Amino acid sequence: MDERRLIRVSKYLSKHLRHQPERLGLTLEPGGWVGVEQLLAACAANNVAISLAELHEVVEQNNKQRFGFDPTGQKIRAHQGHSVTVDLGLVAQQPPIILYHGTAKHNLAIILRDGLRPMQRQHVHLSRDRATALQVGARHGQAVILIVQADELFQAGQAFFCSDNGVWLTTAIDPAYLALER
């Protein structure tokens, strides 16, 4: 599959596995899972033909590893980023001392005043490395990187989760735990 098709299919899956499963007539199971055959049939019924081989390619080749199959290969889900309520079954764990959050420069003043909020998602997304944060922030304009004092937040009682693709998740972050990387 060429790169453009890979991106289009990935975006289509993101939309329907993270935000609007009902638009395809899908109901996410606990953990955010949906049957592979059910997903492919729903896509086809909505005039979007995706083959099983293409689905596997998107899961394997997506640079952010947004999706994963269950151990049987019969179900698929988005690893994180849901705006619909989904319990991914992640276990709270101690985060690294610091994590990073990339954002566009035009968001900076509000974030430094109000902190990081999940917005339309269930969680704030954090990266273990600054390169990933920079890539995320650059999607919406000139990127800036915020350093998150994750261990301090954890010690203060805030829960952190690490998704299957290595993205750290938490609830809102007070600005006192944020610093602009210079």
Curated annotation (Swiss-Prot):
Enzyme Commission numbers on file: 2.7.1.-
A GO MF label: NAD+ poly-ADP-ribosyltransferase activity
Gene name as annotated: kptA
Keyword Transferase: yes
PANTHER family: PUTATIVE PHOSPHOTRANSFERASE, TRNA 2'-PHOSPHOTRANSFERASE 1
Source species: Herpetosiphon aurantiacus (strain ATCC 23779 / DSM 785 / 114-95)
Protein name: Probable RNA 2'-phosphotransferase
Role, per record: Removes the 2'-phosphate from RNA via an intermediate in which the phosphate is ADP-ribosylated by NAD followed by a presumed transesterification to release the RNA and generate ADP-ribose 1''-2''-cyclic phosphate (APPR>P). May function as an ADP-ribosylase.
Family: Belongs to the KptA/TPT1 family.
Key words of the record: NAD, Transferase
HAMAP family attached to this UniProt entry: KptA
NCBIfam families xref list: PRK00819.1-4
